[in-house]
């Protein structure tokens, strides 16, 4: 069984036992998180939401809180010798999907 979950402005296809890297979620390591914005549930019978599947949820457990790899942002203006280099590390959460309720 799988589901399509919407979180952090993105959509993820998940199954039970999967590890998922998402935008930072509130909570400590070991806490459980429940997603109620389920767009689709698949398996023996596929249910597509309009836009959400009613009474469906996905439960996950927070495995790690941290930062992603550094992304370098380089800006320059032509013929002016103007350059700017910035670095950015996005906060992220790693989850383990425990249960899909359809």
Swiss-Prot record:
GO biological process, one term: translation
A GO MF term: structural constituent of ribosome
NAD recorded as keyword: no
Residue intervals passing through the bilayer: none
InterPro entries: bL21-like, bL21-like_sf, Ribosomal_bL21, Ribosomal_bL21_CS
SUPFAM superfamilies: L21p-like
A Pfam family this chain is assigned to: Ribosomal_L21p
Record keywords, A-Z: Ribonucleoprotein, Ribosomal protein, RNA-binding, rRNA-binding
Keyword rRNA-binding applies: yes
Cellular compartments per GO CC: cytoplasm; ribonucleoprotein complex; ribosome
Family of this protein: Belongs to the bacterial ribosomal protein bL21 family.
Function: This protein binds to 23S rRNA in the presence of protein L20.
Entry-linked NCBIfam families: L21 (TIGR00061)
Subunit record text: Part of the 50S ribosomal subunit. Contacts protein L20.
Protein name: Large ribosomal subunit protein bL21
Organism: Citrifermentans bemidjiense (strain ATCC BAA-1014 / DSM 16622 / JCM 12645 / Bem)
Gene: rplU
């Amino acid at each position: 069984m799988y589901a399509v979950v919407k979180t952090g402005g993105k959509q993820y296809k998940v199954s039970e036992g999967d590890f998922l890297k998402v935008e930072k979620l509130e909570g400590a390591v070991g806490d459980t998180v429940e997603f109620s914005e389920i767009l689709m549930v698949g398996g023996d019978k596929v249910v597509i939401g309009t836009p959400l599947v009613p009474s469906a949820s996905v439960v996950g457990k927070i495995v790690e809180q941290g930062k992603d790899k550094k992304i370098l942002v380089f800006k320059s203006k032509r013929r002016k010798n103007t350059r700017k280099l910035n670095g950015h590390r996005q906060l992220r959460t790693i989850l383990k999907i425990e249960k899909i309720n359809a």
